[in-house]
A protein has these predicted regions:
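N-terminal cysteine/histidine-rich coordination modules
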Residues: 1-57, 61
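Long non-globular sequence segments
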Residues: 161-168, 172, 183
Length: 183
């Protein structure tokens, strides 16, 4: 979006973890406020109108109707954690939060490189986004323990990874499916 530039492109203005988005993973988007490839965004426009806050949570009007309406459906990533993730970044500090996101991205990259049958990118991105870091580590440890799978067919490896991720999601009481816009 013209004139909208941010220093932190890995974690968006509104609380989306750009670093875990399939569009950024695929190289199609530079992240929130990252320049060329950035999509037009009503929340970015609002930030510019409000003086260019780095995060919505810094705005005096937060949370506003524009912010809340954005959660009606997911885009390429789940929107359900935006407010909680903004609060977490504020609580532990942006650098610590970004370090956690980068660790999740490392796991996501490993899943995509070694445990993918070219049909799991959305699932893996949603899992990296929604599951806690420790849950993702448990999945990777369980996959590493299945040495017979390591050299197996991609489809079997992907099925094993997907099953472990789904089990962790069920344990946490969350769904790894994106919420589509109704109507």
């Amino acid at each position: 979006m013209k004139g909208f530039v941010r220093e932190c492109t890995e974690f968006s203005l509104c609380g989306l973890a750009c670093l875990l988005c399939p569009m950024q993973v695929g190289g199609y988007c530079p992240g929130c406020g990252g320049g060329a490839g950035n999509q037009s965004c009503a929340i970015a426009r609002c930030s510019l109108e409000q003086g260019g806050t780095e995060f919505c949570s810094e705005c005096a009007a937060y949370p506003c109707a524009r912010y809340d309406e954005f959660d009606a459906a997911d885009s390429f990533v789940p929107h359900s954690r935006r407010a909680a993730d903004l609060a977490r970044a504020r609580e532990i500090g942006l650098d610590a939060w970004l370090a956690q996101l980068r660790q999740k991205r490392t796991i996501l990259d490993e899943l995509l490189a070694d445990w993918n049958d070219d049909r799991r990118k959305s699932l893996y991105c949603a899992a990296a986004y929604l599951l806690e870091l420790e849950a993702l580590r448990r999945v990777m440890d369980a996959l590493a323990a299945q040495s017979d799978l390591a050299a197996g067919p991609a489809k079997e490896k992907a099925q094993a990874a997907a099953a472990l991720l789904q089990a962790e999601a069920e344990r946490a009481g969350i769904s790894l499916k994106l919420n589509k816009r109704k109507g």
